[in-house]
């Protein structure tokens, strides 16, 4: 169950502590919460970390599920996300560092293949979605499958 030590994350918004504390008290996963608000689990987690904007409907549904005062939650989440400041560069958290390492090692290869397939341009991180799946192979090994989908 993902939780948050706010002292380790000084750049997160005020709402992060409130949301993560309520999530822990309710013993909910991001998948549980995502199902309730009608988003995927990565988009839901991004709201908790202040990296995605919650709609008014999201705030109402979060308040309902997490038993939080909707007005207070809306006040804390009403601004625009301050994206990209929540992670030190290079990252120190091992899993986040591995994702960074993937971009270091494969970034230019991704760029070359994307340019060959789509021409000159960039993949949007705004018109964007992502998903995480778990696969188990025939030998019982678990594999993480991360899909990145951005408008070209």
Curated annotation (Swiss-Prot):
Q: Tell me what this protein is called.
A: Cyanate hydratase
Any idea of its EC number? 4.2.1.104
Q: What SMART domains would the database entry show?
A: Cyanate_lyase
NCBIfam families (UniProt xref): cynS (TIGR00673)
UniProtKB keywords: Lyase
What is this protein's gene name?
Answer: CYN1
Q: Where is the active site?
A: 98, 101, 124
Question: Which reaction equation describes what this protein catalyses?
Answer: cyanate + hydrogencarbonate + 3 H(+) = NH4(+) + 2 CO2
Provide the family line.
Belongs to the cyanase family.
Q: What does the entry give for GO biological process?
A: cyanate metabolic process
GO MF entries: cyanate hydratase activity; DNA binding
């Amino acid at each position: 169950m993902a939780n948050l030590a706010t002292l380790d994350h000084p750049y997160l918004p005020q709402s992060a502590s409130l949301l993560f504390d309520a999530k822990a008290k309710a013993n909910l996963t991001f998948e549980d919460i995502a199902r309730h608000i009608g988003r995927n689990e990565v988009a839901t987690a991004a709201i908790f970390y202040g990296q995605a904007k919650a709609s008014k409907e999201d705030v109402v549904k979060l308040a309902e599920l997490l038993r939080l005062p909707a007005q207070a939650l809306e006040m804390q989440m009403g601004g625009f996300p301050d994206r990209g400041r929540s992670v030190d560069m290079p990252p120190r958290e091992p899993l986040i560092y591995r994702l960074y390492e993937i971009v270091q090692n494969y970034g230019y290869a991704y760029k070359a293949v994307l340019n060959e397939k789509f021409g000159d341009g960039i993949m949007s991180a705004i018109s964007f979605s992502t998903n995480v799946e778990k696969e188990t192979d025939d030998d019982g090994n678990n594999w993480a499958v991360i899909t990145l989908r951005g408008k070209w």
